[in-house]
C-alpha cells in the first residue's frame, strides 16, 4: 500500500508540472475494445492527441477479474476516483448532428466529406476507440432532492480521455450513453434519442447564450433499442440508443468530494471511501493545481488558505452561473449535488426547460413533485449545494471557515451579477442606481400578473419608444399585449391537476390528522392545487376584454416607471444619439430572440425519430445565433415550423403553440 500511495504521489507531482490548459502529450498505444483484434484507423479524427492526466493523478480501480461483462457489474467502488470500463457497441450507429464550434475546441475543422460523418458515428458512439483513449467511469455521490443517496457515479457516461490541442488547451471528452458501468445500478447505461437530442442542443444553446456550460460535440443514434417508461405511467416503449459526445475542462462535480461521507443520519447511506482523507487531499490537489493554478501558486505553502480561496472561487462562479440562468429563464430541473460542476458550469441536461409564460414557481421537471427545483428556488438550492460541498471538504477546509465564506460571498455575488445583467437587458448603460433592483422586481411582477412571455417580452423592450409622445407607443403596446397570455392559455395553464374528490379527501385529512398529512409530504402539492382551483375560478368570471384592459393597466404603470429611469440614464450621456445607439445595441446583445423551448426540441425529436435529422441540424444552427443581428431576416424566414395539418407556419421566435403546454419532461427525459 505504501508503494501504491508513493506511486500516486509521484504521478500527481508530474501532473502538477503541466499548468492549466497546457499539454505535453506523449505517444499512446492504440486503445482496443475488449475482443477486438484491431481498431479502425481514424482519418478526420487522426489529429486528436490524448494526455489523460486525471487517470495519472487520481486513484483508478482496476476492474476485478471475472467473466466478460464483470468490469461493468454494479458494485461499490471504494478507494478510487475512477474505474476502467469499456463502451458497449451499438448496432449501425448513425450521426444525428455535429457541433462544429464545439469540435473546433479540439482543433477539428469541419468534416471534409460524408465519409467523416461515418467516422464520427463510429468513434463518437464508442464502437471504436481513438488512439490514446482510456475509457473510465468516475465515482461520485450526491444529495438527490435533499437526501444523501450514497454512491452514484457515471452510470451512463464514460471518460474517454483528455485531448491536448496545438494551442496548449486541454479538453476532457465523455461519451454519454455508451453502456453499463459499475455505477449503472439496475439501469443499462444507455440514453435514448429524445433525451440525447435535448442535451446536445441545450449544451450548445447555453454556450451561445453566454451561460457557463459543458459542451456537446456530436450526437450519434443507432438501431439498438432499450425500453423506457417515459412518464412512469406503465406505458413503456422501445427507443433508439443514442450517445452524446460531451466536452469540458473537467466533469468533476460537488458530488466527487462526497465519496468520503460517513453514514447519513437520515438515509443511513455512506460514500464508498469513508475515512480516505488521503484521497480527498489528492482530489483537492488535482482540482486546484489543474483548474485553479493561480490559487495554487498564491497559496502553495498554506493548504488551508489555498482550500479556502478555492471554495471562495467555486462559490462565486456558482453564484454567477445561476444568476445567468435566472436572466435567460433557464430551469435546470435536477439540481442535485452530483449535477453541480466544480468549475461553475451548467452540467447534466435532463428535464430542463426555458420559461415561456413567466412564472417564478415554474417547475420544469414533472418528477419534482414538491417543487424543490422551481425556477425561483434555483439560487437558494445552489447555495444549499455549496453548503454540502463545504461539509464534504472538511477537515481540509474547516467547516466554520467554509460556512463563513458562503455567507459572505454567495448572495452578494449573485445579486451583483444578476442586477448587472438585468441592467443590460433593460438597456441601462450610463448610470447604476439603487432603485434598479425595485424596477426589475416590478417588471417581473408585471410579467407574472399578465402571463407575459419571458424571452419575447425582454426582446421586445428594445423597441420601446423612448420619446414621451412617440407615435409608435400604441403599436408597441399592441405588440406587448400579444406576448401576454390569452384567457385560453391561462385556463389551460391553471387547470386542476387533481380529481376534486381526491383533493377534498386530502383537505379532510389535513384537518383530522395533520401529523399523518405532514408525513405524506404532499403539503406543497396541495397548496399548489388549491391555488390552481382558485385561479381557475377567477378566470371563469373574466372576459377576454377585461383581461386585455387589466393587462394594459399593469403594463402602462411599469412602462411609465421604465421611461422615467431611461430619462435618468439619458441625462448622464453627452450625446443622445450615441446613447440611443448604445442602449439598443446592449439590449440586442443581452436579450435573445431564440431559446430552446420545449416545443422546438420536441419538433426536432419527432422528426429524428422518423429518421429525418435535418430539423435537429437546423435548430442547432438557429441556436448558434440567438441574439439579434442585422442579417436576421433570412434567418427568421427559415426559423419556422409547420403548425398543424393546415401547414400554417409559426416562427420559432413566437410564443409557443397551445399544444406545447401539454409537453411533459421527467428525469427519464
Curated annotation (Swiss-Prot):
It comes from the Eukaryota. The modification Phosphoserine is found at residue 653. It is found in: Mitochondrion. Keywords: ATP-binding, Magnesium, Metal-binding, Mitochondrion, Nucleotide-binding, Nucleotidyltransferase, Phosphoprotein, Selenocysteine, Transferase, Transit peptide. Residues 1-115 form a transit peptide. Residues 634-654 are annotated as: Disordered. Its main location: mitochondrion. Mg(2+) binds at residues 339, 348. This is Protein adenylyltransferase SelO, mitochondrial. The lineage of its organism: Eukaryota, Metazoa, Chordata, Craniata, Vertebrata. The gene is SELENOO.
